[in-house]
Amino acid sequence: MLSAPPTVIIDVEASGFGRGSYPIEVGVALADGRTACFLIRPQSDWTHWDPTAAALHGISRDLLAAKGRDVREVAASLNELLAGSTAYTDAWGMDSSWVALLFERAGLPQRFRLDAVARLLNDEQKAVWADCKSLVRAEMCLSRHRASADALVIQQALERTGELRRTARRGSPLSAASPESP
């Protein structure tokens, strides 16, 4: 049986959590295997900065000032990459508000939809989701917590847990597929 094509995944790193936070990096993993990542230069009134979040993603204010792109450029690039598609996130509640803020500040309409990865998972997949993401991250030797790397991990974990829908339960659904001896 042919497997379903990979799903488009989006991930957002932010200045912190909650009120006053804003997007600082957006990463996508596309269905064709490409990834894209955009650092975002904060707007002048985006001053919230949570040291705990910064320690997690490792992005400094200095890096954003030096390498960050204007919100309009990032929003236009996302529209170009994702127009007409649905991009899935494993943190829909937060990521959707940060993407909405990005497009609001850019003054551009968002030309793609965001939806929750959880809507794609059945109960068996949900039960192994966190472990599968950890396993995929380890297998890919990704230690950094950055948007494009996280999007790729989510995409691969979704594909891996999708095997639960497509194959009989032989061995661990998280391990590499290998035929068992009768």
Where are these predicted regions, by residue range?
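Metal-dependent phosphoesterase core characteristic of DEDDh/y 3'-5' exonuclease domains
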Residues: 4-6, 19-24, 30-59, 79-182
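Short His-Asn-centered micro-motif
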Residues: 10-12, 67-68, 89-92
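Short acidic, Gly/Ser-rich segments with clustered Asp/Glu that frequently serve as metal-coordination loops
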Residues: 12-20
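Metal-dependent phosphoesterase signature
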Residues: 55-77
